[in-house]
Amino acid sequence: MVNKKYRQDSKDRYQYKQYIYRSIGGIVPPEMAETVTANQTAQWEAGFTPYHKLRLAIKEICKTDGIPNIKWGMYIAFGEKLLKSYLKMKAGSASSDMIAEYINNAISAFSSRTGISQETAQKIADFITSNY
């Protein structure tokens, strides 16, 4: 089973694995493997935390709303898709009205397709807009 918890040694373990992968066979010089590994580790670390924090929050929201844990995956998928789109729109030139309209449309479309609770989806959207 893969360990999906971010621990104190997660960054070091990831960096070690990437260095081994990059330097296998001796084709790549060690300095280049170190540079690539350091850059890739920084990108990994920057992208890991937002989604991890979101997953933990979604699990708590689902627990408090009484959603069976077998359905949590749908809520996590919704939250990750919404976060990706939200960050893209926020970085671009989208106005707050456009973002709010997109979120409302995403909630209704996803809930009609999958049958998830609109109230819970709205709580997830509120978490995303207030924390990112």
Curated annotation (Swiss-Prot):
GO terms for cellular component: helical viral capsid. It comes from the Viruses. Keywords: DNA-binding, Virion. It is found in: Virion. GO terms for molecular function: DNA binding. Transmembrane segments: none annotated. Heterodimer composed of major capsid protein 1 and major capsid protein 2. Self-assembles to form a helical, filamentous nucleocapsid mesuring 900 nm in length and 24 nm in width. Together with capsid protein 1, wraps arounds the DNA and maintains it in an A-form. Capsid proteins probably maintain the DNA in A-form by non-specific desolvation and specific coordination of the DNA phosphate groups by positively charged residues. This certainly protects the viral DNA under conditions such as the extreme desiccation of its host. The N-terminus projects into a DNA groove. This is Major capsid protein 2.
